[in-house]
């Protein structure tokens, strides 16, 4: 709700607030559609089963977060189902309960100032690494193209953290893991005993990184199955591949037109 009005369903405008109301309505409409599409990308790529997982997106200008509702099958989702909250977790618009992981997403948005999307899955291979409480090593340039280092794993949550505000504490554990790491250079983490979270500049970018994470997690498993003594990629080659794509002087891809 916004000012007591369901802005997604609203079709009439009145008074001097017409323009603001319309612009806000369009902002939420666009954000919801982007978040829905990112959630459906997880389905298309085989990263989620049933109602597993969730993707959110944030509008930094309005400090609003849109996220998949809790327990709703992907096949049933429409933009109107996407729930919008502020950074305090107060529902701004939407009739359904938000994902139970909302508090984790909000912690990441609060602490990682450059991100605009968060994706959480229980994809098979990335989750296996999380359950093994083992960082995903970089064995090759595919990993290096997206993550400038091993994908880290959080510490285990304490009994008190689990019994308390569990989802918020999960987010806090992720943020502690990145106290000395750059979340822009390694846009993913494995939550110990749980599953991965990924992020990016948008909901679509977060979902994209979740797809790539699962791919490199699977390749790392296969690499170790072939050779248990496989060595991580040389630091020089690792940095070369990451920086040619994401660095200040990146030259991968096409020059954007002005």
Q: Which sequence ranges carry the predicted segments?
A:
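Cationic, low-complexity basic patches in intrinsically disordered or flexible, solvent-exposed regions
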Residues: 13
């Amino acid at each position: 709700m916004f000012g007591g009005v369901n802005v997604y369903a609203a079709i009439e405008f009145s008074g001097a607030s017409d323009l603001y109301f319309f612009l806000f309505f369009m902002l939420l409409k666009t954000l919801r559609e982007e978040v829905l599409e990112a959630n459906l990308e997880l389905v298309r790529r085989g990263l989620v089963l049933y109602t597993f997982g969730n993707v959110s997106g944030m509008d930094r200008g309005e400090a609003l977060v849109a996220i998949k509702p809790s327990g709703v099958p992907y096949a049933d989702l429409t933009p109107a189902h996407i729930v919008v909250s502020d950074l305090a977790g107060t529902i701004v618009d939407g009739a359904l309960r938000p994902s139970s992981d909302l508090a984790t997403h909000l912690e990441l948005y609060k602490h990682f100032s450059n991100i605009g999307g968060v994706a959480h899955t229980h994809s098979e291979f990335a989750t296996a690494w999380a359950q093994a409480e083992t960082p995903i090593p970089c064995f090759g340039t595919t990993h290096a193209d997206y993550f400038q280092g091993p994908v880290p794993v959080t510490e285990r949550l304490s009994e008190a953290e689990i019994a308390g505000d569990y989802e918020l504490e999960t987010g806090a554990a992720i943020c502690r893991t990145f106290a000395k790491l750059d979340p822009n250079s390694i846009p993913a983490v494995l939550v110990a005993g749980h599953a991965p979270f990924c992020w990016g500049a948008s909901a679509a970018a977060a979902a994209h990184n979740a797809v790539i994470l699962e791919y490199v997690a699977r390749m790392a498993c296969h690499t170790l199955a072939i050779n248990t003594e496989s060595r991580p990629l040389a630091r020089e080659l690792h940095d070369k591949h990451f920086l040619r794509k994401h660095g200040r002087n990146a030259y991968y891809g096409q020059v954007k037109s002005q």
